[in-house]
Amino acid sequence: DYTLYQSGLFSTYAYLPYFDSKEMPVRAIAVSKDEKLIGSRNGLFYIDEKKQRFKSFKVPELRSNMILCIYAFEGKYYIGTYGGGIYILNPSTLTLSDFETADLKSTPFLKGHVFCIKSDDEGSLWMATSMGLYCYRDGKQIRHYTTENSKLPGENVYDICFDSTRKGWICTENGLCIWDPSTNSLKSDMFPEGFIHKDKIRTVYEDSNHELYFLPDKGAIFISDLSMNHFRRMQSGTPLDGKDAMFIIEDHEGWLWIGTNLGLYRYDKKGNFIPYNFVDGLPSSIFITCFPVIDEEGTMWFGNSKGMIYLTSEQNGRKAKWHYPVAITDVLVNGKQSVYAKMS
């Protein structure tokens, strides 16, 4: 008999006896000083440990149990679902409401898919949906981009990422386009030859060096400067080869954390990778598309296919110091002691 050793570097979040994320596929998280909001394929969960409040939301209270995104905006949480549109959670009353807008039934906000919700620096709220890209300000729709009325490459919009120059990178099922704030329009003719704009991109991330990381649905990560004058694929021959990147985030030491469909890695941008696995406390090597959060105390929170896991700032990026040698005590072949074992 044996027990696999785990260092406890990562921990799986629980708020017992009310909630345990163990074995839960976590797709969206929001973490503030006191509140945690966790979205999964099994509904939505709100936790406030300081005030000892907990509430779960599932069908039939929700139109869909599959939560795709959570975004904190003006004191409330906006929740995007797969097939159930948008909900707004008021954390003071722990009540849900629909997103109020004119012609609600003709939008995806009741029964459509809402993949991403973000705000820009002007306070506008953008929604990436199965019916194009929406923009709202002060509760009123000011834009709705579709493939018919704009340069949007596809109706299914998966993500929108605003960079430090205020440009918005729009990720669709058929490739990229750019929201140009100087002209208030979408553009698809700004990309140089050899760029990744025709691929299906999961998300775009800007690091502290103002480099953009494009995570394609399949293939190697693509890296570019903001002006798209210099770009490249991530070098081959790394632990990421053959894996699909699901998310990327930079920590306080300037390293990148990259979650894939087969493992979690910390990368120093110079060719050095640190892999993490079951021994480090990961419940599963399979990560799904869930953008991580770094809270005020420096703790990192990740969505995993088997729970919401976290890494405190004291443990950030460090492997356990203790190494345990493997010792073979017996060898069995088809349930019987082998000749080697008898000789030893």
Where are these regions (language model features)?
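Residue-level detector of Asp-centered blade-edge/turn motifs that repeat once per structural unit
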Residues: 31-34, 72-75, 119-122, 162-166, ...
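Conserved beta-propeller blade signature
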Residues: 35-38, 76-79, 124-127, 167-170, ...
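Loop/turn residues immediately N-terminal
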Residues: 1-3, 42-45, 82-86, 131-134, ...
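Short beta-strand segments and strand-loop junctions that repeat across beta-rich extracellular domains
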Residues: 44-48, 120-122, 163, 177-179, ...
